[in-house]
C-alpha cells in the first residue's frame, strides 16, 4: 500500500496571512500535512488559529520550534521587519523556510520618527541590500529550501499564461500589473516604521513579483539571460487634498508613506513592465497582469472575475458571507468570489511548496524572486 509522505509545519505569526496559509495547507493533495505548531507573541491569537485550523499546539516563543526535530518547515507570516532574522535562524536550525511577502525592508532606527520623510532612500536601499545579502549567504550554504509566498505567481491565469508563453517561446514586449484596493485595516499600514513603505511595499510587490516571474519563464524558454536594467517610480500621497469628510469612505491613513505608486521596469532586452498600486480604489480589490508579446495578448484577471455575479436587495443572512475583499456592502450587483483561495493562488502556492519539500523540487517562487522584488521596490 502506498504511504503518503508527511510534511510537518511550524507557523510563526497568527494574523491574516496565517489563515490564508493554513487554509492552503489543508487543501494540499498527495501528501500528509501535519500542522503541528502555531506561534505568536499574542498567545490568545495563536490559540484561535490553532482551534480554527487544527494545529496541535500554540506557543509564544518561536525558538521552541527551531529545536523541534519533527518540524520540517518554518512558515513565516510575521510583519516583514522580522523576516530576515527569523529566516536565518530557521535555516541555520536545518529547517526549510516559507516567507511571506515582502522579503524585507527598511524600518528605521530605534526611536526614529517619520522614517519615510526623513531617511534618504539611498540609505534605505543600502541597508536592505545588506540584510538581503546576509540572508542570501545563509540560503546558499544551508542546503534547505527558501520559498517566497508570492501568490500572484500561482494564480491560475498567470500559471496558464506562463504555459502558453513557454510553448510558443513568445517574446514579452510589455506587461502591466496592478494590485489596488481601499487602504488597509492594519494600524501599521500608514507608518513606514511598521511596514517598510507604503502601497508599493505592501501591495505593489505582488504584480512586480508576478511579472518578474513571467519574464523569467520567457528567458528559460528562449534560452536567454534577461535582467532588470532600470527602475523608474512615480509615488505620492493623493489623499492630502481631501478634507476629513471627504475621507469617510477610504481606509487609507498615510503618515509618512505613499498611497499611490507607478513603477516602470526596463529589462536588458529593452522590454517594459508597469506595476500600479493605489490605496484609493473603491469597489473591491483590483488584481491583474496583462501580458503583450510578439504574438499574443494575455489578460490575467485575478480579482475580480465574473464567474459569479450576484445581486441582492438586502444583506439579510449574509453577515458571515464575504462577497469579495474590501466590499463593505453586499447589495446590488457584485462580482462575488468563487473559491478565492484557489483563484488568488494560495492553494497552488502551498501545493508547490509542499511538493518541493517532499520530492526535493525547485519551487516556482524562491529566493531569487524575493530578492529581486525587494531590490526593485527600494531601487
What is each stretch, according to the model?
Residues 1-3, 73-75, 141-144, 352-379:
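C-terminal helix-rich "cap/oligomerization" subdomain common to oxidoreductases
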Residues 142, 149, 155-187:
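Rossmann-like NAD(P)H-binding beta-loop-alpha module
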Residues 186-272, 277-284, 368, 372:
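Rossmann-like dinucleotide-binding domain that binds NAD(P)(H)
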